[in-house]
Amino acid sequence: MKLEILESFENKYPNRDYTIEIVNPEFTSVCPITGLPDFGTITIRYVPNQRCVELKSLKYYFFEFRNAGIFYENITNKVLDDMVALLEPRSISVITEWKARGGITETVSVHYTSQS
């Protein structure tokens, strides 16, 4: 989960508020307690400022989680923190929706709004 993997490009419309939504329905990680794989959908929704995330780099960033033992809540917050560091967006939300484990599903959401 290296921030250095992520790349961005210049937003050609920085004076316009518009929303970018990215959905990865095949997100995987590993439960740090059981070592079993976790499967989920991750959605990133943001209003860009000066930069936009480059999707191929985001795909490789997501691959970094495949073998990582990490809790759902930590994944969601880590992705938000890394995206804020990379993009400095006007606002951003990260939502993770996890497949049932033992009959229980979980959804974690976190939001950031720029103070400027």
From Swiss-Prot:
Pfam families in alphabetical order: QueF
Catalytic activity field: 7-aminomethyl-7-carbaguanine + 2 NADP(+) = 7-cyano-7-deazaguanine + 2 NADPH + 3 H(+)
Chain residues that bind substrate: 53-55, 72-73
Keywords of this entry: Cytoplasm, NADP, Oxidoreductase, Queuosine biosynthesis
GO BP term (any one): tRNA modification
Organism: Chlorobium chlorochromatii (strain CaD3)
Protein name, per record: NADPH-dependent 7-cyano-7-deazaguanine reductase
Chief localization: cytoplasm
Active-site residue numbers: 31, 38
NCBIfam families cross-referenced by the UniProt entry: QueF-II (TIGR03139)
This protein's pathway: tRNA modification; tRNA-queuosine biosynthesis
